[in-house]
Amino acid sequence: MGNLSVKFGSVEFKNPVIMASGTFGFGKEYNEIYDIQKLGGISSKGLTLNKKPGNNGMRVHETSSGMMNSVGLENPGVQGFIDYELPFFSKLDLVRIANVGGGTLEDYLLGVQMLNDKPIDIIELNISCPNVKAGGMAFGIKNEVAREVVREVRNITKLPLVIKLSPNAEDIVGMAKVCEEEGADGVSLVNTFKAMAIDIKNRRPVFENVYAGLSGPAIKPIALRMVHEVCKNVNIPVMGMGGITKATDAIEFIMAGATCIQVGTANFINPRIGIEIIDGINEFMDREGIKSLDEIRGII
């Protein structure tokens, strides 16, 4: 059996398979189905400074090869996470990632500060959140806006910092370079693509917010290309994601240069997918005589 362990900066993962934020809660429900401590890591449900009820109306809509969501970051807030979810989350024998979002720069800073002394291994900063002081445009669209967020957060935390990039950014490679320049320990990509669906019977958008995030197999080829481009242009490690539903998808992302991979939408299709991907990577390595993932990472 090959060695699945990977080093992401200063953090060691037992294997490269991470459950993506917003698709795995804080792990409790899935732990009733299988031993989630076999996973490499879990990225928590997206946390905001204050508790959020989420969006009204339709939140999830199935597409031909994936799904759209407009959940609206429903979450217990950072303090709620610390009080009610962290006692379970912190005891897991895997890499514990806190995904943090915000509506203002101050929200990001206060949220991360509250987690600084908590048993968290990585902060994953979600810069796809709308900036309420800039007309709702996401922080992760323009490089210089993202630069300020990354710089300020980097200045107030010593925890490993990973920036989750939006595929809707004006220049995703440039965005990754900005994150590296401002001291991020890594980047994760891609988040969901801005998309739309229309209810033709009622002649209105399916979602109250009109647009929603597209994920699932439909986005994989584009996500893979973006991960490959970023990996070729930065010297910090990358967590690759976007449409991964099986072990061969994960292996493609690793061959494109990703150190780790994240699995999101596939959790809704098959709640055991994380374990199946780990087993599939193991089988591939045995079949191909691969001793370490370093042998195939970034070979494309």
Swiss-Prot record:
List the active site: C129 (nucleophile)
Which compartments does it reside in?
Cytoplasm
Q: Which GO terms describe its cellular component?
A: cytoplasm
Q: Which reaction does it catalyse?
A: (S)-dihydroorotate + NAD(+) = orotate + NADH + H(+)
GO MF entries: dihydroorotate dehydrogenase (NAD+) activity
Please provide the record's keywords in A-Z order: Cytoplasm, Flavoprotein, FMN, NAD, Oxidoreductase, Pyrimidine biosynthesis
Predominant location category: cytoplasm
InterPro entries with a match to the protein in the record: Aldolase_TIM, DHO_dehydrogenase, DHOD_1B, Dihydroorotate_DH_1, Dihydroorotate_DH_1_2, Dihydroorotate_DH_cat, Dihydroorotate_DH_I
Q: Which EC class heads this enzyme's classification?
A: oxidoreductase
Which parts of the sequence bind substrate? K45, N69, S70, V71, G72, L73, N126, N191, T192
The free-text cofactor remark is: Binds 1 FMN per subunit.
Q: Which GO terms describe its biological process?
A: 'de novo' pyrimidine nucleobase biosynthetic process; 'de novo' UMP biosynthetic process
Cofactor or coenzyme needed: FMN
Give the CDD domains listed for this entry.
DHOD_1B_like
Q: Which residues are noted in the entry as FMN-binding?
A: S21, K45, G46, N99, N126, K164, V190, G216, G242, G243, G264, T265
Instruction: Report the EC code(s) recorded for this entry.
Output: 1.3.1.14
Under which pathway is this protein filed?
Pyrimidine metabolism; UMP biosynthesis via de novo pathway; orotate from (S)-dihydroorotate (NAD(+) route): step 1/1
Top-level taxon of origin: Bacteria
- What is its quaternary makeup? Heterotetramer of 2 PyrK and 2 PyrD type B subunits.
* Primary role: Catalyzes the conversion of dihydroorotate to orotate with NAD(+) as electron acceptor.
| Family that this chain belongs to | Belongs to the dihydroorotate dehydrogenase family. Type 1 subfamily.
> What is the protein name stated in its UniProt record?
Dihydroorotate dehydrogenase B (NAD(+)), catalytic subunit
Gene name in the database record: pyrD
